[in-house]
Amino acid sequence: MDTIAARALTVIKACNTLKEVRIVVESNVLEILGIAVNRYNGLTLRSVTMRPTSQEQRNEMFYMCLDMILAAANLNVGNISPDYIQNLATIGVLATPEIPYTMESANEIARMSGETGTWGPDRQPFGYFLAAPEVTQHGRFRQRVGQNVTTSIVSSTLAQVSMNAGARGDIQALFQNQNDPVMIYFVWRRIGTFSNAAGNAQDTPQGVTLNVGGVNMRAGVIIAYDGQAPVNVNNPGLGQGMIEIEVIYYLSLDKTMTQYPSLQAHIFNVYSYKNPLWHGLRAAILNRTTLPNNIPPIYPPHDRENVLLIILLSALADAFSVLAPDFNLFGVVPIQGPINRAVAQNAYV
């Protein structure tokens, strides 16, 4: 399937070079389009030309691009337009070994397949304590009954530790049972003045410490923590004290936007508003997938099918901009006048 996707991407990118009618195209573009268009026309009985000039010819070339991304993504959109009918024979065109694919497209698909098929540590965009259902006021001493050391979540990146006088304890549990981290990078600081249980201001004694695996860590210095070693805090003073723990970032095997080059830019290109036709077409295609129709996904796509579809749809979005197709789509009402921010804003609400 990688070769089919590489051919589809190659053909669409070749079509995207036809910005001007009289442009002198590269020889490899002529070779790619010459073979692809002939094969496509022969199997589908359509009449795509290599030099589209009229609106009808531009539509036909865009239909070919659309057929190819649907075939490569193994999607069937059904009846979405009175003017366009998906040609299921297109998969036979892309399976033709005579159609060449470029080194660039082959490398893109190889990277996509390789990265979506494995896992690697990457910096996560969300705070480590994002899933905490409850937070505590920052700088407010809080001690659970029967404990001398209590940890509390303040925000998605901040936690604090309340310690009784002379208290010592392991706070490793603060980092456990969440996010499956490979490495956590955090800083701890002494809270100089805090509010005690009665609401009065109180100073944290000097000499409070934090150690990881038995090694004391300096306050205000980033600590690389693997989540396995014990994390002990100690308040040797005669009064209550507090420290703050800020998780700067953490690494885990969850997929991010950096799993594939320019994935975030591809997603923006797919979900950007070009006109009502593109807005409706994108929704009609994504409606057959697990990706959102109109709003980018909260979490990065991580499986091969969705990442491949984003790459192919981004190339199709470029073809849409270059070929400027104009056809009817069920449920889409054309608008009059230029596209501005207000028009785009209205499309997403």
From Swiss-Prot:
GO terms for molecular function: host cell surface receptor binding; structural molecule activity. Pfam families: Orbi_VP7 (PF00897). Keywords: Capsid protein, Glycoprotein, Outer capsid protein, Virion. GO terms for biological process: fusion of virus membrane with host plasma membrane. Glycans are attached at N148, N287. SUPFAM superfamilies: A virus capsid protein alpha-helical domain, Viral protein domain. It comes from the Viruses. InterPro entries: Capsid_hemagglutn, Orbi_VP7_capsid, Orbi_VP7_capsid_C, Orbi_VP7_capsid_N, Virus_capsid_a-hlx_vir. It is found in: Virion. The keyword Glycoprotein applies. One of its GO terms (cellular component) is viral outer capsid. The VP7 protein is one of the five proteins (with VP1, VP3, VP4, and VP6) which form the inner capsid of the virus. This is Core protein VP7. It comes from Epizootic hemorrhagic disease virus 1.
